[in-house]
Amino acid sequence: LDPPAAYDAGGAIAASSQVDPTLLNALDGLPWYELPPPKSLGKEWFETWVIPLLKASNATVRSQVATYTEHIANKVASAVLQTVNRCKTEALMSPTAILMSGGGVHNDYLMARIRQKMSDAGLNLNILTDPSLIDHKEAMIFAFLGLQVLLGRSNVLASVTGARQDSIGGSIHLPSHMEHFQLPLQCRHINT
């Protein structure tokens, strides 16, 4: 890239470049996407599967950035659509909003592509990208997991983690000055 860039600020490179259809088909067709959850992406997966495709491609670096951005938008929109359809099939509450997080949220072009793809699929979800939510996502998740412990509910789900069974992970530690504190009735199973 000229000038060199560590990342595509706001998606400007992707927005001003052409998607390479051959590379996009190769990326979208990676076998990992067909695996059932739980699954996780990591640096090793990217280096093993994606980097070789990029190196073998005849596309310019700018086109590769546009193509990979489109690939991410395809896969995020597809995963959201699958989740919404599963919720409908299993008669679960149908989601009305989705919290997006991670560095990609700061890529305006990527977020616009995801919104467009979801709209094209008939999904009109409110995509939450509020920095006050995104920047504190992990704290909110751990507060939610702690609440599940207080309520005596499993917070480690086999369907998500691959564990053999659901379980309650974590513990509640109260300071000594709260030794006479009474937990709510639902939480009396907890040893403090």
Q: Where is each model-derived feature located?
A:
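Eukaryotic N-terminal low-complexity, Ser/Thr- and Lys/Arg-rich leader segments
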Residues: 89, 172-192
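Short amphipathic alpha-helical surface patches that serve as generic macromolecular interface elements
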Residues: 107-111, 115, 136, 140-143
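Thr-Gly-centered strand-to-loop micro-motif
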Residues: 14, 101, 129
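Glycine-rich phosphate-binding/hydrolytic loop that grips phosphoryl groups
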Residues: 70, 128-178
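A contiguous, well-structured pocket-lining segment that forms one wall/lid of small-molecule binding clefts
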Residues: 2-96, 108-120
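Short helix-capping/linker segments at secondary-structure and domain boundaries
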Residues: 1-5, 80-83, 147-158
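Glycine-rich beta-strand-to-loop/alpha-helix junction loops that act as flexible
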Residues: 96-107, 139
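Short hydrophobic/aromatic-enriched beta-strand-loop microsegments
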Residues: 121-129
